[in-house]
Amino acid sequence: MEINREESDLTKYVKITNDTDLTASGTAQNNDAKIENSRLSIAIGHNALVKDSDTKYTHPKDKTPDNPAASIAVGANANVTESPYSIALGKNAKVLNSEYSLAAGTNAKVEKSEKAIVQGVEANATNSNISIVTDFAAKAENSKDVIVLGSKTESIRSNSTVALGNRTSVTDSDSAFVGGDHASATTSAGALVLGNGAKAKTVSLTADNGVLKAGDKTIFTEDNFKMLLKQLYTFEDGLKTKEKNGKTVVSLDKETIKQMA
């Protein structure tokens, strides 16, 4: 008995534009997978797209035809645009205006970054070169040389930092290591922060009207200083200094002592 089989023609759902060196593209649904101006690339999935990755953001950064895109977009609406040597893997995964980068996971995204690896649902790296971002909604923004690992963990405007844990954050910091759920480092340099909820923050010292503050906390006043002097030194009549047991003894007159009492 002969069985009739109807073979689907995937090529009618494929669109390849201005490409050479045998790019590959395909979809199982009635929406085109597309490759445009991106040689040696692969697009597979519903509306998957590799676009304009030959001519921009290439290395070296010029428009020579000797720099093929060699990029891959796999998944529904996966998108690699103006991003050579990059991979978008997963539904709505995107690599945009980047190079040598990977976005893997639903809604994962790399944008304006070089050598970035992003893995996880809604994980993203923006303007963050040489970065590794992993886990749900983890992110790196305006950072460089960072590792971000944990759910909703983030690195913001930081360099050479590591953030490990859930909802951990590093902000405006350099060379910091933060490990622990909800731990954080803010405006810190060289900080080591370990433990759940642990924090590091750089504060500025200010002095005004006899009051010394660290951030918004008062740490010293004029009265504190007078009290400290009385504890550290023995005051004698007259204004003079002398050596005693290898130390300089400062002597004040009685009127000055009364003012400090």
UniProtKB/Swiss-Prot annotation:
It comes from the Bacteria. InterPro entries: Serralysin-like_metalloprot_C. This is Uncharacterized protein HI_1718. It comes from Haemophilus influenzae (strain ATCC 51907 / DSM 11121 / KW20 / Rd).
